Amino acid sequence: MFPVVWRNTARADLRQIITDIAAENPGAARRLKIRLETVVLPLSEHPYLYRTSDRIPGLREIVAHPNYIVLYRVTSSSIEIVNVVHARRQFPI
């Protein structure tokens, strides 16, 4: 079982996404935040659950929402959540 660790870059991405959405729709922002934070939970026991990234070597991708992708890396001791990106605007990073 691996710990899931959010890097500062991923936390900053998440914070910015939620802030932007909350300006227009606070309820949608809360729901998306919950979704993005919970979609990574199975990684602790199943680190290879999601596909390898064709765009960024060494990373894996979770399409957590039609517009948002969570990028993560499996290391020898943990799962690192690296970035959360908008599928159209910020990808590839």
At which residue positions do the language-model features occur?
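Basic/aromatic recognition patch in beta-strand/loop cores that engages polyanionic ligands
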Residues: 48-77
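Absolute protein N-terminus
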Residues: 1-2, 93
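Basic, Lys/Arg-enriched alpha-helical interface segments
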Residues: 3-59
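Short clusters of hydrophobic/aromatic residues that line enzyme substrate/ligand-binding pockets
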Residues: 43, 62, 91
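Enriched for short, Lys/Arg-rich terminal
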Residues: 30, 68-69, 73-93
